[in-house]
């Protein structure tokens, strides 16, 4: 069964409502200043504290140093960290040494070229790969990419792969059928306005995922 991550939550109320609606994981953008959905570590800690025990919490970061991630993990205590910048494998190794219990998800930007080679570098270091559409702002723009490329990457790496980039209730079934990911990630595709999830769209998105074979 394809898992669902609802990303860009900004309040405990939204996060809990998404979890109750059936999300497997809740994502929060911590100190990612370029995003309108950016929240502080304190806010993320509060969101994490209200989630049910079997719903994963994922903080999304674009850190300058491994130490920033280590500090955030110790404060927020998330299930996983999604590294959304250009962090090399050694960056992840350093984090694992300091906080070995946290899962690490590395974003690969599709459209830059050499994606398979980049993804393979993180085998044995990352716990999963997330495929987002490349953009001048480093992804997170709500734009789709070629899902056939994603499927090729998924078939070439020995890691669970999460598909992101412009997904919505209208296209997620097609995306799953094309790429066959471990999980799908949605942010703006389930919003009526920025920073606020539309629970009708959240439920519709999750329903589309669950019924897709």
UniProtKB/Swiss-Prot annotation:
Record keyword Amino-acid biosynthesis present: yes
Biological or metabolic pathway of the protein: Amino-acid biosynthesis; L-tryptophan biosynthesis; L-tryptophan from chorismate: step 3/5
UniProt superkingdom: Archaea
EC number, UniProt record: 5.3.1.24
BP terms from Gene Ontology: L-tryptophan biosynthetic process
Family of the protein in this entry: Belongs to the TrpF family.
GO terms of molecular function: phosphoribosylanthranilate isomerase activity
Top-level enzyme category: isomerase
Keyword Isomerase: yes
Gene name of the record: trpF
Protein name (record): N-(5'-phosphoribosyl)anthranilate isomerase
Pfam family, one: PRAI
Catalytic reactions on record: N-(5-phospho-beta-D-ribosyl)anthranilate = 1-(2-carboxyphenylamino)-1-deoxy-D-ribulose 5-phosphate
Species this chain originates from: Methanocella arvoryzae (strain DSM 22066 / NBRC 105507 / MRE50)
Keywords: Amino-acid biosynthesis, Aromatic amino acid biosynthesis, Isomerase, Tryptophan biosynthesis
């Amino acid at each position: 069964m394809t898992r669902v991550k609802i990303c860009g939550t900004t309040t405990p109320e939204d996060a809990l409502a998404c979890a109750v609606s059936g999300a497997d994981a809740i994502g929060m953008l911590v100190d990612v200043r370029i995003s309108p959905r950016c929240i502080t570590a304190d806010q993320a800690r509060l969101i994490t504290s209200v989630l049910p025990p079997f719903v994963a919490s994922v903080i999304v970061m674009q850190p300058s140093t491994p130490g920033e991630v280590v500090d955030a993990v110790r404060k927020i205590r998330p299930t996983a960290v999604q590294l959304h910048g250009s962090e090399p494998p050694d960056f992840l190794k350093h984090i694992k040494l300091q906080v070995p219990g946290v899962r690490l998800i590395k974003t690969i930007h599709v459209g830059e070229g050499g994606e398979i080679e980049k993804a393979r570098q993180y085998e044995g270091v990352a716990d999963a790969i997330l495929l987002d559409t490349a953009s001048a702002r480093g992804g997170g723009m709500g734009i789709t990419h070629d899902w056939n490329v994603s499927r090729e990457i998924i078939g070439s790496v020995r890691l669970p792969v999460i598909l992101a980039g412009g997904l919505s209730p209208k296209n997620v079934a097609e995306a799953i059928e094309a790429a066959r990911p471990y999980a799908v990630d949605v942010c703006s595709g389930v919003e009526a306005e920025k920073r606020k999830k539309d629970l009708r769209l959240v439920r519709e998105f999750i329903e589309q995922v669950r019924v897709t074979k």
